[in-house]
From Swiss-Prot:
Chain ranges passing through the membrane: none
Known pathway: Pyrimidine metabolism; UMP biosynthesis via de novo pathway; orotate from (S)-dihydroorotate (quinone route): step 1/1
Chief localisation class: membrane
Annotated residues for binding of substrate: 71, 116-120, 178, 183, 248-249
Lineage: Bacteria, Bacillati, Chloroflexota, Chloroflexia, Chloroflexales
GO molecular function (one): dihydroorotate dehydrogenase (quinone) activity
Family from the record: Belongs to the dihydroorotate dehydrogenase family. Type 2 subfamily.
Protein name per UniProt: Dihydroorotate dehydrogenase (quinone)
Protein location: Cell membrane
Superkingdom, taxonomy of origin: Bacteria
Membrane topology annotation: Peripheral membrane protein
UniProt xrefs under Pfam families: DHO_dh
């Protein structure tokens, strides 16, 4: 309720400036005496039916924060207080870089969407490593999303991913490999089989050298064809990827009403949801949930999260939803999700995962 009073004021600011204001508030309140306990009492809500396991990690619920919201890894404690089960920080590059010039983040309220062309603005792996060591909360699972520096030639991209992996994997619960941002020139060429195999082979080699190897997830683009996505999934499975994150932002613009619809960058939010679910279903049908899918794109309500789960996602993440619904979004989605599961006779998220993909597959086979 309070956020809906504040939101009109925030929406008068440039979108990136508003994000900075909100995250500064999050950062401050999580460090004040007594306030964290009060915030947790207001926003934390869990239900045993929502518990999910993946790669030896236990998630209190399937709902997490997607990469992009906390690029510096200094909001983990605050986001844990709001009731998210996991936070994916980043994208993190080896060296600090400013990203693209502003303005570079745009709200599309008519479409419940955002367009960003941030361009991997990053404080670099050294600063993020320091922030991860300083975090207080250990009850939230932390993933690190890694990418390459803009000025690194594509033929040397593996070196960037490897350096960031070595620096940050020991400090994280899992690592997400971002090959799909539309805002770094040439990055999506890493979806090509030979380049992807080289990248994953090196990361797996480094991972096997860790005392405790980390699950590695691969974040993919929604703008590839289903045949191309199948090729990426097969390469990932052969390499030993532990999950696929579907999807990143899209370059598509169909059906948008906002006057800002033609801004350059990746589109997120409600318009992405149908395509994200299509990709989630496609991956689930290929893998049968092993490795699982982490669903991202257009999650603003419990119904959205539930649709992703039924399409095949074991975990779901959001970012744009926080902009429009505010800090109570995790609590509201989890409450609604528990009700939806019980309404349909499911005792757990796992039981509901992929039921729509399986049903549609069965229909096609009979047809």
């Amino acid at each position: 309720m309070l956020y809906h009073l504040i939101r009109p004021l925030l929406f008068r600011l440039d979108a990136e400036r508003a994000h900075d204001v909100v995250t500064a508030m999050f950062r401050a309140t999580s460090r004040m005496p007594l306030l964290p306990r009060l915030i947790s009492a207001l926003y934390a809500w869990d239900d045993p039916a929502l518990m999910v396991e993946w790669a030896g990690l236990r998630f209190a619920s399937p709902l997490g924060v997607a990469a992009g919201f906390d690029k510096r890894a200094d909001l983990v404690d605050a986001l844990a207080l709001l009731g998210f089960s996991h936070v994916e920080v980043g994208t993190v590059t080896p060296r600090p870089q400013p990203g693209n010039p502003g303005p570079r983040l745009f709200r599309l309220p008519e479409d419940m969407a955002l367009i960003n062309r941030l361009g991997f603005n990053s404080h670099g792996m050294v600063a993020v490593a320091k922030a991860l060591r300083a975090r207080r909360s250990r009850r939230v699972i932390v993933g690190v999303n890694i990418g390459k520096n803009r000025d690194t030639p594509l033929e040397r991209a593996v070196e960037d991913y490897a350096a960031t992996f070595v620096a940050l994997a020991p400090l994280a619960d899992y690592v997400a490999v971002n090959i799909s941002s539309p805002n770094t020139p040439g990055l999506r060429r890493l979806h090509e089989r030979a380049a992807l195999e080289e990248l994953l082979r090196e990361l797996m080699r480094l991972n096997h050298g860790l005392l405790y190897p980390r699950p590695i997830a691969l974040k993919i683009s929604p703008d590839e064809t289903l045949d191309q996505i199948e090729e990426v999934v097969r390469a990932g499975c052969e390499a030993g990827v532990a999950a696929f994150i579907a999807t990143n932002t899209t370059l598509a613009r169909e059906g948008l009403r906002s006057r800002l619809a033609n801004e350059t960058g990746g589109l997120s939010g409600r318009p992405l949801a149908p395509r994200a679910r299509q990709v989630i279903r496609a991956i689930y049908r290929l893998t049968r949930g092993t490795p699982p899918v982490i669903g991202v794109g257009g999650v603003l309500t419990a119904d959205d999260a539930y649709a992703h789960i039924r399409a095949g996602a074991r975990l779901v993440q959001l970012y744009t939803g926080m902009v429009y619904a505010g800090p109570a979004i995790a609590r509201e989605i989890k409450r609604g999700l528990a009700q939806l599961l019980r309404r349909d006779g499911f005792v757990s998220v796992t039981q509901a995962t992929g039921v729509d993909a399986e049903w549609e597959g069965a229909i096609r086979q009979r047809g």
